[in-house]
């Protein structure tokens, strides 16, 4: 059935900005406070209270403009978006409509090895609304105004997305960029980054269908589920002879289904007009250029550098660059040692990340321990200790139980790498093994593993396996 249909998707992503105060007031911009704790007269819509622009929000929008290839508009205007809801005490939302701060950007996504350019129509600043709470009392609803006035950057894509996988890839890439430039913390669980999905269906090659908007999706899992369900729902309606209504939809996470909340509004329903309490934003080129210097290295540039300059495998480099703190830790480690970056990268995404996960740590917590970590990796890389011994010592090093070299001595884990000593052990191991030696010389490579194991046993596991392997091959080929 769905083989004859295709989905067309555009996304409206709301990113809460990493500011200390709100967009138009001095109230703290922080998550997790007691209800209605971070509210002043401006936030609560008291008569006569005038908004004051937080210019840091403008700077963060400009930074996003550079990171996402936008045109940065020197002239932009804040307007009132008029609608009534209990958690919007002013009776309108201050947003940007006709003259947004950013227009015509794009981001490249990688969906299972397939590259695609996703165009972004616009990004504009606006204030968030409060929160209505309906599950405390069966008779009453409660309002928490802490979120009112929280600065949002709404990033609106063109309908260039055509699958749930592409949408998740787009959201993931967008989140990564915003976190790299320190504009948004990307915490979807707390609502710092959420998406409205505009989805329509059509037969392949036909005109665009009527779209429905699925509101406030705050996890990749829910985005995927909502898209897959809504795609099937719209096809079922059309194939049953029905017509898609332009509705605003809610995704029910308990049932995995979408349902209509209300008919979808058009822009003229909101009666936008310039906010008389706020002057237009007029930026100078100097202001824009000053922000550009703070953008820093973006994820794709870091990925390319790790692959080309440091010879790190692409899949491993992707894991390291997915979070900014991962990349910071990696670059700090390689700056403190002559161990090959590729070797460090393999340990980082393996045992080091495993330790971080098992102990519920922040990656940044290891930034003060990079010297100890790289000292340990140097011992492994130089064959002073085995890879197995390195894995045994790593948790002790990360828990601050001593220097790697001291722990090695204390536990007696230093490898036997003396060629003369190993030659004697190998010669003794080959005594009486004429039959197996003949098998090896006849082409049986498996016998080599048997001999290596025998020699390691003779050294109580402390023999350097690389050196044992080398000497054995020299002996067996004679």
Indicate residue ranges for each PLM-predicted region.
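Basic, nucleic-acid-interacting segments
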Residues: 1-297, 308, 314, 336-340
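Structural motif
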Residues: 3, 311, 335-344, 384, ...
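Amphipathic alpha-helical segments in well-ordered regions
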Residues: 64, 230, 347, 351-355, ...
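Core structural elements
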Residues: 190-203, 308-331, 341-358, 371, ...
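M16/insulysin-pitrilysin zinc metalloprotease superfamily fold
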Residues: 337, 344, 352-366, 371, ...
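Strongly charged, low-complexity linkers/loops
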Residues: 363-378, 387-457
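Short, amphipathic C-terminal "tail helix"
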Residues: 445-478
């Amino acid at each position: 059935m769905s083989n004859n249909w295709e989905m067309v998707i555009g996304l409206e992503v709301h990113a809460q900005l990493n500011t200390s105060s709100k967009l138009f007031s001095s109230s703290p911009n922080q998550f997790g406070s007691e209800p209605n704790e971070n509210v002043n007269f401006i936030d609560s819509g008291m008569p006569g209270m005038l908004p004051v622009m937080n210019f840091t929000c403008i700077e963060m929008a400009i930074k996003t403009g550079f990171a996402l290839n936008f045109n940065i508009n020197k002239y932009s205007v804040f307007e009132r978006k008029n609608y009534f809801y209990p958690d919007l005490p002013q009776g309108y939302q201050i947003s940007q409509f006709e003259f947004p701060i950013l227009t015509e950007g794009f981001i490249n996504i990688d969906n299972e090895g397939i590259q695609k350019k996703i165009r972004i129509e616009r990004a504009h600043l606006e204030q968030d609304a409060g929160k209505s709470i309906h599950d405390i009392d069966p008779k009453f609803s409660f309002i928490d105004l802490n979120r009112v006035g929280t600065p949002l950057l709404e990033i609106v894509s063109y309908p260039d997305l055509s699958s749930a996988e592409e949408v998740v890839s787009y959201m993931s890439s967008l989140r990564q960029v915003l976190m790299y430039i320190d504009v948004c913390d990307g915490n979807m669980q707390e609502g710092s980054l959420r998406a409205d999905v505009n989805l329509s269906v059509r037969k392949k090659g036909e005109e665009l269908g009527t779209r429905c908007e699925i509101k406030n999706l705050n996890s990749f899992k829910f985005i995927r589920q909502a898209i897959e369900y809504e795609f099937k729902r719209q096809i079922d309606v059309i194939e049953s002879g029905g017509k898609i209504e332009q509705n605003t939809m809610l995704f029910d996470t308990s049932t995995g289904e979408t349902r209509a909340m209300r008919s979808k509004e058009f822009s003229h329903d909101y009666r936008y007009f310039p906010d008389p309490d706020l002057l237009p934003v007029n930026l100078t080129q100097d202001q824009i250029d000053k922000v550009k210097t703070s953008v820093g290295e973006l994820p794709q540039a870091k990925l390319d550098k790790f692959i080309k300059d440091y010879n790190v495998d692409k899949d491993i480099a992707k894991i390291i660059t997915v979070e900014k703190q991962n990349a910071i830790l990696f670059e700090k480690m390689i700056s403190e040692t002559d161990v090959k970056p590729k070797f460090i990268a393999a340990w980082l995404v393996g045992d080091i990340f495993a330790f971080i996960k098992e102990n519920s740590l922040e990656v940044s917590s290891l930034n003060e321990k990079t010297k100890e970590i790289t000292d340990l990796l140097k011992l492994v890389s130089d064959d002073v200790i085995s890879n197995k011994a390195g894995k045994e010592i790593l948790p002790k090093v990360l828990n601050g139980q001593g220097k790697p070299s001291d722990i090695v001595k204390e536990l007696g884990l230093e490898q036997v790498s003396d060629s003369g000593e190993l030659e004697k052990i190998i010669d003794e191991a080959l005594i009486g093994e004429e039959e197996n030696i003949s098998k090896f010389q006849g082409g049986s490579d498996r016998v080599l593993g048997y001999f290596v194991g025998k020699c390691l046993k003779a050294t109580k596991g402390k023999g350097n396996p690389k050196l044992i392997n080398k000497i054995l091959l020299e002996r067996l080929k004679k």
